[in-house]
Amino acid sequence: MIKHTCLQNVVTSPSNIKHHFIFFRIMKVAIVTGGNKGVGFGICRGLAKVFDGDVLLTARNEERGMNAVKELEKEGLTVKFHLLDINDPKSVGALAAFIKERYGGIDVLVNNAAIAFKQAATEPFALQAKVTIATNYFSVQDCCNQLFPLLRSGARVVNVSSMAGFLGLIKGADLKSKFASSGSTLTYEVLDGLMKDFVDSANAGDHAAKGWPNSTYVVSKVGLSAMTRIQQQKVSEDSSLKDVAINHVHPGYVDTDMSSHKGPLTPEEGAKSSLFAATLPQGTNIKGKYIWHNCELVDWVNGPKPDV
């Protein structure tokens, strides 16, 4: 629903006072990080078809971002581009400032940008841990910290997790118990500490002995999913915001660069769960949930994990 606001601008002059009425439309906006290719591009395409407002495709490379916009234009779809490197707080701040001035708030935020090292990667595991956790967890957290103050009531936030983000992949009982408390007693500070402990343990070479998996991507996405549950808890406690839904989704095994094009799903099919979460109706009870690629809700803590 589009809202209209009337502002009265009073101009005072020595001789008289004139009343000017300015009508403007409050534009809705949906932001997709990492939107120039893969699942992110599929999400932008899907939102451009159904979202009543501007769709902002963001990417860290302007040329690739603009090429993605032009590709959608050839399909008769309109999206806008904004430069964004989620690893650069100043870049995130520039986006936040633009959104605040241009739109006044955020209606949909899809945190899709992420990285994954290939199985054949030659970088040391400790380096992979440092880079992956920094990007997939802490940089997404920074985006949320800077953009969440702009969320409007009724906003939808989608954190693109993964089947790798399923809690059952954490085998250490103590670690699993701590992650499972997200959404109830786990704090951001303790969760941050868990992420840092993994990086430190990977550097020391004793991460497996502590119950961590041998996958930096798994840890990053489990952390993102746990963060999602805390975010929903905090937003639900905020009386200034109504009906904000924050969910984490598994896009499926998708034919993208990240999967080395081994996935059976198309980017459009991979976008399905994100589009479902981004367009949940008013008053939805789907909040803080783990949504599978077929849009079914999965018990993130107890499972069982469905088929890929």
Go through the PLM ranges and name each one.
Residues 25-56:
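Canonical Rossmann dinucleotide-binding motif of NAD(H)/NADP(H)-dependent dehydrogenases/reductases
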Residues 62-63, 83-94, 126, 137-140:
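The beta1-alpha1 cofactor-binding region of Rossmann-like NAD(H)/NADP(H)-dependent oxidoreductases
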Residues 142, 244, 248-249, 254-256, ...:
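C-terminal helical subdomain
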Residues 122-125, 129-130, 153-241, 250, ...:
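Catalytic loop of short-chain dehydrogenase/reductase
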Residues 94-97, 101, 120, 125-134:
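Active-site Tyr-X3-Lys motif and surrounding loop/helix of classical short-chain dehydrogenase/reductase
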Residues 51-67:
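Conserved glycine-rich Rossmann-like NAD(P)H-binding loop of the short-chain dehydrogenase/reductase
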Residues 112-119:
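Conserved NAD(P)H cofactor-binding loop of Rossmann-fold oxidoreductase domains
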Residues 139-144, 166, 224, 274:
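Conserved internal alpha-helix within the Rossmann fold of NAD(P)-dependent oxidoreductases
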